């Protein structure tokens, strides 16, 4: 470690201790050497004994700065790892930091645009930022080319070295978690940090966010439910993004929405419909749909439309994940826990040797009490959370795409019930899920699959006769070679009849291995094993002739 890293690590540990976070470690895990090390190097009493543990953890992360704040925000969505009182406190972390100098932002924009002054591209550039966060800040302007109002998002200067330095230390601390916490291995701390690192590095590339926004805008073009502001790709780079400026009501401002005459029931239902449309129709969903990124258009309040911004984090599901997820929801609400258990095994989410009966019983034990509530009050997000927590006890591997989905679903539910407390998520989502599943089977699904594969088949059709001819010729050559060797073996008078069997098998295996080695290199070690087996059989046959 460099001296700078040592100083930073020392500050991190002292901060944790000043908030009494060593209480997280069971006393039996604090050995005498560790206790001596703690008091000799880090003498720091708990200065916040009047606060609960979750609040102390939140305040400590807030004090450590942007990288740790965003880490805490990500951890707040992993409710499979933390009890509710800690996850709820982490969710309160605010990604708000002091803005950097607007003149510096202007210099970055000019560098990204080839060194020309800002005035060559934009009018009315506002030096004071509209908003500021740990990764980037936003300025307003007008495009010189068409006069449209835009926002310019600029990455903070020199943020990457800071992020990499703190991530390196977070990895170091993560490796200590399994040694200090009794449940440390189950938490898989290194995997959690790796997931966070990927998300954070992705957020630093505004070209990626631009592409995500363009894709979402295309998916919901002319939709009455969701509007994504236009991105101007000619002005975008890794460190800068330019998009249409929007005016809307923050989705969390219920009073203003009601004052504007918004149809709150329809707005809440559309939030659920937008989410399931993204997941099941498009396989591409906005995975950062917290209230700060969602607005509602002022226009047509009786037919309200969402406006989505900040598309830096997105998720996607493959066709199998979507099918298993939809069937899991339907099986759960039908209380078919056997089906839920089998779906987890079939999908590969849990090992194939999982005892289905035990798994079914565990799911029933955890999920059956949920139905004590009225159906309208059941949370999809918590259903998924309960299923994941139960499956984790049966060695379910972390599924990053499902974690993102569960986090987003909790956001959607929270917003929907804030807008319209009587929102019945199951009633809203069930027709969509049943329709989607029905669409995946039967003749329509076969026709669609044929249409999807037809271009590939048409492209390969001219090559088909040659491929068939080559396969037949190679097979004929192999058979001819085997027959020839068999005839030669039969012409020899060996003293033991079994030698022919071994020699023939040996020759066949060697030739087969040679053929596969040349024509099918992707088969890996298989040709080698065949040739080795052939040589052994040949040797046994030769020995029998002695």
From Swiss-Prot:
What Gene Ontology cellular component terms go with this record? Answer: plasma membrane
**Residues forming the catalytic site:** 288
For this protein, the parts annotated as crossing the membrane are 501-521, 522-542
What is the role of the protein in this entry? Is probably a protein kinase regulator of UbiI activity which is involved in aerobic coenzyme Q (ubiquinone) biosynthesis.
The Protein kinase domain is annotated at: 124-502
Which EC numbers characterise this protein's activity in its record? 2.7.-.-
Where is it mostly found? membrane
- In which domain of life is the source organism classified? Bacteria
Alphabetic keyword roster: ATP-binding, Cell inner membrane, Cell membrane, Kinase, Membrane, Nucleotide-binding, Transferase, Transmembrane, Transmembrane helix, Ubiquinone biosynthesis
Q: Which GO terms describe its molecular function?
A: ATP binding; protein kinase activity
The pathway noted for it is:
Cofactor biosynthesis; ubiquinone biosynthesis [regulation]
Output this protein's name: Probable protein kinase UbiB
């Amino acid at each position: 470690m460099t001296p700078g890293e040592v100083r930073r690590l020392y500050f991190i540990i002292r901060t944790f201790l000043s908030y009494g976070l060593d209480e997280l470690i069971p006393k039996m895990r604090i050995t005498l050497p560790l206790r001596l090390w703690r008091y000799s190097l880090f003498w720091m009493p708990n200065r916040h004994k009047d606060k609960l543990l979750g609040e102390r953890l939140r305040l400590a992360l807030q004090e450590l700065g942007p990288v740790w704040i965003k880490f805490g925000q990500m951890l707040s969505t992993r409710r499979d790892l933390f009890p509710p009182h800690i996850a709820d406190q982490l969710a309160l972390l605010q990604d708000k930091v002091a803005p950097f100098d607007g003149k510096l932002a202007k210099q970055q924009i000019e560098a990204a645009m080839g060194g020309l002054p800002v005035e060559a591209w934009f009018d009315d550039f506002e030096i004071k930022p509209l908003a500021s966060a740990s990764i980037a800040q936003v300025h307003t302007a007008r495009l010189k080319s068409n006069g449209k109002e835009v926002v310019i998002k600029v990455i903070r200067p020199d943020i990457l070295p800071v992020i990499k330095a703190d991530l390196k230390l977070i990895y170091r601390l993560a490796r200590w978690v399994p040694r200090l916490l009794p449940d440390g291995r189950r938490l898989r701390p290194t995997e959690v940090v790796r997931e966070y690192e990927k998300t954070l590095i992705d957020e630093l590339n505004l070209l990626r966010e631009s592409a995500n926004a363009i894709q979402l805008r295309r998916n919901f073009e002319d939709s009455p439910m969701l509007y994504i502001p236009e991105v101007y790709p000619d002005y975008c780079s890794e460190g800068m993004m330019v998009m249409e400026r929007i005016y809307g009501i923050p989705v969390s401002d219920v009073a203003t929405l009601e004052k504007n005459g918004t149809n709150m029931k329809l707005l809440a239902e559309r939030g659920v419909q937008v989410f399931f449309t993204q997941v099941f129709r498009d396989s591409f969903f906005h995975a950062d749909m917290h209230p700060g990124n969602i607005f509602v258009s002022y226009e047509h309040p009786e037919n309200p439309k969402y406006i989505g911004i900040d598309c830096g984090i997105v998720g996607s599901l493959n066709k199998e994940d979507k099918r298993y997820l939809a069937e899991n929801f339907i099986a759960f609400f039908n209380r078919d826990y056997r089906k839920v258990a089998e779906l987890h095994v079939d999908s590969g989410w849990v090992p194939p040797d999982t005892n289905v009966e035990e798994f079914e019983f565990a799911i029933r034990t955890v999920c059956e009490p949920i139905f004590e509530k009225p159906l309208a009050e059941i949370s999809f997000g918590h259903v998924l959370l309960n299923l994941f927590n139960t499956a984790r006890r049966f060695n379910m591997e972390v599924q990053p795409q499902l974690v993102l989905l569960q986090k987003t679903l909790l956001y959607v539910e929270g917003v929907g019930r804030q807008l319209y407390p009587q929102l019945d998520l199951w009633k809203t989502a069930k027709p969509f899920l049943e329709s989607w599943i029905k669409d995946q089977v039967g003749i329509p699904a076969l026709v669609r699959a044929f249409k999807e594969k037809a271009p590939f088949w048409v492209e390969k059709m001219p090559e088909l006769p040659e491929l068939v001819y080559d396969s037949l010729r190679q097979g004929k050559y192999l058979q001819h070679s085997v027959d020839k060797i068999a005839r030669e073996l039969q012409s020899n008078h060996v003293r033991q009849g079994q030698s022919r069997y071994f020699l023939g098998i040996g020759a066949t295996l060697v030739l087969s291995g040679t053929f596969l080695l040349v024509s099918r290199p992707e088969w890996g070690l298989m040709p080698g094993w065949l040739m080795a087996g052939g040589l052994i059989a040949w040797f046994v046959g030769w020995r029998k002739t002695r």
